[in-house]
């Protein structure tokens, strides 16, 4: 179920299901009342994770999105707020989860862990700190390591990120106002509950299927 005003899931819907974890998508730069959702998750012992790939920089009640859950994902794919061409990031304050993510990111090895965590793992599984320890697989893993070129591109863009986010916000204001004022055709997306909207795109929710089909037809071959 979705709330068309905020482009988000309604918090009361969450209460209907017996969940162990919730992977919440902050869609297109917007979010629902995530503080309410977090309170529900805390009360019901639901692990809250944020998919923040489209909302880098959006602020809600004094906090940037991506800081409400146990962890948050960010995408640096082409077209997002900042780009490394491919790749992304996972942010967390949980040391146990961070250790697991570093292991899974690189084949299941412990090479990217600090010395203390390496020693703890090797002691737990009785692995000698020799040549063989570098080729011990502690878990199923992938090769998700970014390249130096991707990292260079990302680092170069960081100093422009604030400017990019502000420009996206300004573009959204300029484009959305005339669209949402046409209340006979479109639902207005509310963003006043946000301290800052770092949107990914301008959501257009048509009031009828006919209006939607007209827009799609006009964009054929253009987009």
Where is each model-derived feature located?
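Hydrophobic side chains within alpha-helical segments
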Residues: 6-8, 57, 83-84, 89, ...
């Amino acid at each position: 179920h979705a709330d068309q005003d905020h482009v988000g899931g309604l918090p009361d819907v969450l209460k209907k299901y017996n969940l162990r974890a919730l992977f919440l998508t902050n869609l297109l730069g917007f979010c629902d009342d995530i503080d309410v959702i977090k309170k529900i998750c805390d009360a019901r012992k639901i692990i809250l994770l944020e998919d923040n790939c489209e909302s880098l920089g959006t602020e809600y009640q004094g906090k940037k999105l991506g800081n409400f859950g146990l962890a948050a994902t960010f995408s640096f794919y082409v077209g997002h707020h900042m780009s490394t061409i491919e790749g992304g990031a996972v942010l967390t304050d949980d040391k146990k989860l961070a250790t697991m993510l570093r292991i899974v990111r690189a084949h299941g090895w412990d090479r990217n862990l600090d010395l203390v965590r390496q020693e703890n793992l090797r002691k737990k599984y009785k692995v000698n700190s020799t040549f063989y320890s570098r080729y011990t697989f502690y878990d199923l893993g992938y090769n998700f390591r970014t390249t130096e070129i991707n990292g260079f591109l990302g680092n170069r863009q960081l100093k422009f990120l604030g400017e990019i986010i502000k420009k996206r916000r300004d573009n959204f204001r300029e484009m959305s106002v005339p669209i949402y004022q046409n209340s006979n055709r479109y639902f207005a997306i509310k963003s006043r509950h946000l301290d800052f909207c770092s949107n990914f795109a301008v959501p257009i929710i048509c009031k009828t299927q006919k209006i939607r089909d007209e827009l799609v037809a006009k964009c054929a071959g253009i987009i």
